Design a protein with these regions (language model features):
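Short intrinsically disordered terminal tails
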Residues: 1-2, 89-95
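Negatively charged, low-complexity tracts enriched in Asp/Glu with abundant Ser/Thr
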Residues: 1-19
Length: 95
């Protein structure tokens, strides 16, 4: 399983530790206008510009095995590890 968090374009974090399962990515059906699905480890955006929580849910629910394998492969790259490290440094200095 891959963790995601969902955030709006204004950067407000809505859901943390979202797993790719047949579950919803809105919090209790409360959906803001536009969503971004982001890999929670590195901060890489997986998909941007989904207009509703329902669209967001459908996108995640229908991620193909190939897409999941591609994300898992990306997580093994040096670029990915650097992004994770950069995100952790940013969190330490901004949160």
């Amino acid at each position: 399983m891959i963790d995601f968090y969902i955030r709006t374009h204004s950067g407000i974090q809505i859901v943390t530790g979202y797993k790719i399962t047949k579950s919803y990515c809105c919090h209790k059906d409360t959906c803001l206008a536009r969503w971004t699905i982001t890999d929670s480890k590195s901060g890489f955006a997986i998909q941007k510009g989904l207009k509703t929580g329902k669209e967001c849910f459908e996108y995640v629910k229908n991620l193909s095995d190939d897409m999941i394998k591609a994300i898992e492969k990306e997580r093994k790259t040096e670029r990915y590890q650097k992004a994770c490290d950069d995100l952790e440094k940013w969190k330490e200095s901004n949160l």
